[in-house]
Amino acid sequence: MAAAVLMDRVQSCVTFEDVFVYFSREEWELLEEAQRFLYRDVMLENFALVATLGFWCEAEHEAPSEQSVSVEGVSQVRTAESGLFQKAHPCEMCDPLLKDILHLAEHQGSHLTQKLCTRGLCRRRFSFSANFYQHQKQHNGENCFRGDDGGASFVKSCTVHMLGRSFTCREEGMDLPDSSGLFQHQTTYNRVSPCRRTECMESFPHSSSLRQHQGDYDGQMLFSCGDEGKAFLDTFTLLDSQMTHAEVRPFRCLPCGNVFKEKSALINHRKIHSGEISHVCKECGKAFIHLHHLKMHQKFHTGKRHYTCSECGKAFSRKDTLVQHQRVHTGERSYDCSECGKAYSRSSHLVQHQRIHTGERPYKCNKCGKAFSRKDTLVQHQRFHTGERPYECSECGKFFSQSSHLIEHWRIHTGARPYECIECGKFFSHNSSLIKHRRVHTGARSYVCSKCGKAFGCKDTLVQHQIIHTGARPYECSECGKAFSRKDTLVQHQKIHTGERPYECGECGKFFSHSSNLIVHQRIHTGAKPYECNECGKCFSHNSSLILHQRVHTGARPYVCSECGKAYISSSHLVQHKKVHTGARPYECSECGKFFSRNSGLILHQRVHTGEKPYVCSECGKAYSRSSHLVRHQKAHTGERAHECNSFGGPLAASLKLV
């Protein structure tokens, strides 16, 4: 194109014709298959850029004027008001994609309030100069679409500028949604057939009808699609077909990067960012941006599930959900990641996965600024700020912020352990627990403490261990002020104050505050001792008991008193010892007011008041309040004298033995 025209062109007004390249039949046949695919990809990319930009030009107030410039046989008509070039071509096949872009521009123009230009003999108003020229030719009696080869031209407007609102027919006063609809209506009303082919002199009311007729008249299709074998009149229509095969999504949302096939889908999507909500559920008050989302949501209240899977019988409220579910049975994964080759059954899953490679996190929390790659993760995160826990356990009334947490919690009541270790056959209620357990068999300890070099199989175990070095106890009980290094330990501790004991033993009816305590307790009934010492073969019902026992063999005493330097094999023994230095006696007897440094000492003391003697001798039936007293008594029956005095010797010892 001439440099003068390029300089004069308004930069913000972009047409797809500016970036589209036409091929004749002869030129197309010279291209190799790879070159044709390259042509398709380049044209699709150009179309995506034009469709995404969507620039428009505001009408000016000057009186209308026209300028014409001839460039390589193409008549360029420029209107001063719009600042746009309208191209007048020799007869070509109408381009459906360009027509779609025009309709898109007109649709977007319906949302804008721009001043329109008034021209012509009948003082009608037009938003597009192409429509103005078409209308003028009705007054002049000209045919606007003419397919002859003698140079007669027609105005083909595909400029993506967006002006105006309504299109009104002056003859009948009828309002139509776009200029093409108005033009078609007027030609029908006036009995005008403005599109004529010179070979047969047949006229048509629409350019698309002329184009179809020309293809029938010529009896040949010039361009074929390799994907489906169909033939087309021009490269533009071929490109339209190939867009379908290529799954083109030319409309991109700039804030989050999502892409869509249609402009209407992009407009609906943008309501998410604007916060526009117009459809509210009367049952629960939940609001939705789109009406069809509300209708889908309402099926949850009615419980209707019309779509049933023929493989497993599972029912769904939506057909698309059923289609997605059926891919579980077929194993279909048609969406491949171009970076790592990983395949997915849903395009949405692929989009989410690709954000791992790009690092994109489009969903940002407006409270703390933290960003997420998935919207559902943001929703879950925001519940930390709001404190919302919408998922309630019907058994114990406990609330959860995520449905997955409720499902995991529900297994406590049902006892379900769906995850099995293939090595030892052990079952687990959580998949994460199974993964951690497998490291026992593999011996994998990939997480190493930088302070002491100790290795762990789980990252969270390493994090918990590192608190030993820092001494941090960030989790404090609001009732008693006691601090803990782990949040779950604080939660367990708080049950002491609330008295909550939701876990019941099915054998004896005893209740426990923690599920782990119930599991350990049940070993009393079963007699299970799964933890064996590899030194002496002694078995224990608790893993912690085995660890303490092994220190007898190793001599390890890791817990040292900072006051006197005395060392102990367990932290509980050290805590009890420190009370000697502090004089703390926190456990008080409610009967006599006596204080004790250890809870076990208080329990033994209370038996003095209650007279309880739970330890009974199996030989004579004598009962004792302490197990140590029973053990000492039983030696009288066995004759065992384990402790011999070697301090005395000589005649005195001999005389004592005689006695």
From Swiss-Prot:
Primary location group: nucleus
Listed Pfam families: KRAB, zf-C2H2
Record note on quaternary structure: Probably part of a corepressor complex containing ZNF304, TRIM28, SETDB1 and DNMT1; leading to promoter hypermethylation and transcriptional silencing. Probably associates with Polycomb group (PcG) complexes; leading to trimethylation of 'Lys-27' of histone H3 (H3K27me3). Interacts with USP28.
Entry keywords, A to Z: Activator, Angiogenesis, Chromatin regulator, DNA-binding, Metal-binding, Nucleus, Repeat, Transcription, Transcription regulation, Zinc, Zinc-finger
Induction trigger: Down-regulated during embryonic stem cells (ESCs) differentiation by retinoic acid treatment.
SUPFAM superfamilies xrefs: beta-beta-alpha zinc fingers, KRAB domain (Kruppel-associated box)
Protein name: Zinc finger protein 304
Homology family: Belongs to the krueppel C2H2-type zinc-finger protein family.
A GO cellular component annotation in the UniProt record: nucleus
Any single biological process term in GO: angiogenesis
Domain KRAB: 14-88
Functional description taken from the UniProt entry: Acts as a transcriptional regulator and plays a role in gene silencing. Probably forms a corepressor complex required for activated KRAS-mediated promoter hypermethylation and transcriptional silencing of several tumor suppressor genes (TSGs) or other tumor-related genes in colorectal cancer (CRC) cells. Also required to maintain a transcriptionally repressive state of genes in undifferentiated embryonic stem cells (ESCs) by inducing trimethylation of 'Lys-27' of histone H3 (H3K27me3) in a Polycomb group (PcG) complexes-dependent manner.
InterPro entries registered for this protein in UniProt: KRAB, KRAB_dom_sf, Znf_C2H2_sf, Znf_C2H2_type
Top-rank lineage group of the source organism: Eukaryota
ZnF (C2H2-type) intervals: 89-111, 115-139, 251-273, 279-301, 307-329, 335-357, 363-385, 391-413, 419-441, 447-469, 475-497, 503-525, 531-553, 559-581, 587-609, 615-637
Species the sequence originates in: Homo sapiens
Processing and modification events after translation: Deubiquitinated by USP28; the deubiquitination leads to the stabilization of ZNF304 from proteolytic degradation.
Localization, UniProt: Nucleus
Record has Zinc-finger as a keyword: yes
GO MF terms, alphabetically ordered: DNA-binding transcription factor activity, RNA polymerase II-specific; promoter-specific chromatin binding; RNA polymerase II cis-regulatory region sequence-specific DNA binding; zinc ion binding
UniProt tissue specificity: Expressed in undifferentiated embryonic stem cells (ESCs). Expressed strongly in colorectal cancers cells (CRCs). Expressed strongly in ovarian carcinoma (OC) tumor cell lines compared to non-transformed ovarian epithelial cells (at protein level). Expressed in lymphoid tissues, thyroid, adrenal gland, prostate, pancreas and skeletal muscles.
